[in-house]
Amino acid sequence: MRYITIALAKGRLAKKAMEIFEQIGIPCEEMKDEKTRKLIFTNEELGFRFFLSKPSDVPTYVEYGAADIGIVGKDTILEEGRSLYEVYDLQMGKCRMCVCGPESAREKLQHHELIRVASKYPNIAKDYFNNIKHQTVEIIKLNGSVELAPIVGLAEVIVDIVETGATLRENGLEVLEEVCPLSARMVVNQVSMKMEQERINKLINDVKKYIETQGR
């Protein structure tokens, strides 16, 4: 029996995902050792392998078949644009991708003015403004605190993930438009879905049943 390999986005998401896998009967004791230097963790008995990855790399591992399954945020899936199957919304880590800025920028958005948009997610921002709003904008990619951009005059608005909106309010910014809702998703390699259909479908269905039970 070949291993089913699962790539997990590092952080809270990986921890929550492993709790779900344990609840559906796929534990991995090796992962509970926080001092371990191992990169790959296995459940030999059931034939599963797990590894932790930077979130933006998870779709790449899945597309190229280095992982059969990935657990990663919808924001990363949209930004990376990889060829894979998105099979289930895990309903964890819910938040929104939004266009944010000072109130004064609202009119510029409404009038489709040429503006600068700063974001850690340039592909999502480009798709939203080009294909949904049909507004010509200049996209500026940032890696740090994008909230700074409108404050220091780098851009009129930002496209970023919003959870509570507290950081925005503290900096005199607000949500001006919602781009899309976000949450953690399960993704599957296209070839693996055909080759290991029975085992992967069982895993998907077991996860679905568990999450639906929790939601009641």
Swiss-Prot record:
The keyword Ligase does not apply. Its EC number is 2.4.2.17. InterPro entries: ATP_PRibTrfase_cat (IPR013820), ATP_PRibTrfase_CS (IPR018198), ATP_PRibTrfase_HisG (IPR001348), ATP_PRibTrfase_HisG_short (IPR024893). SUPFAM superfamilies: Periplasmic binding protein-like II (SSF53850). GO terms for cellular component: cytoplasm. Keywords: Amino-acid biosynthesis, ATP-binding, Cytoplasm, Glycosyltransferase, Histidine biosynthesis, Nucleotide-binding, Transferase. It is found in: Cytoplasm. Pfam families: HisG. It catalyses: 1-(5-phospho-beta-D-ribosyl)-ATP + diphosphate = 5-phospho-alpha-D-ribose 1-diphosphate + ATP. GO terms for molecular function: ATP binding; ATP phosphoribosyltransferase activity. GO terms for biological process: L-histidine biosynthetic process. It is an enzyme of class 2 (transferase). The keyword Plastid does not apply. Catalyzes the condensation of ATP and 5-phosphoribose 1-diphosphate to form N'-(5'-phosphoribosyl)-ATP (PR-ATP). Has a crucial role in the pathway because the rate of histidine biosynthesis seems to be controlled primarily by regulation of HisG enzymatic activity. Belongs to the ATP phosphoribosyltransferase family. Short subfamily. HAMAP family: HisG_Short (MF_01018). Lacks the C-terminal regulatory region which is replaced by HisZ. NCBIfam families: hisG. Heteromultimer composed of HisG and HisZ subunits. This is ATP phosphoribosyltransferase. The gene is hisG.
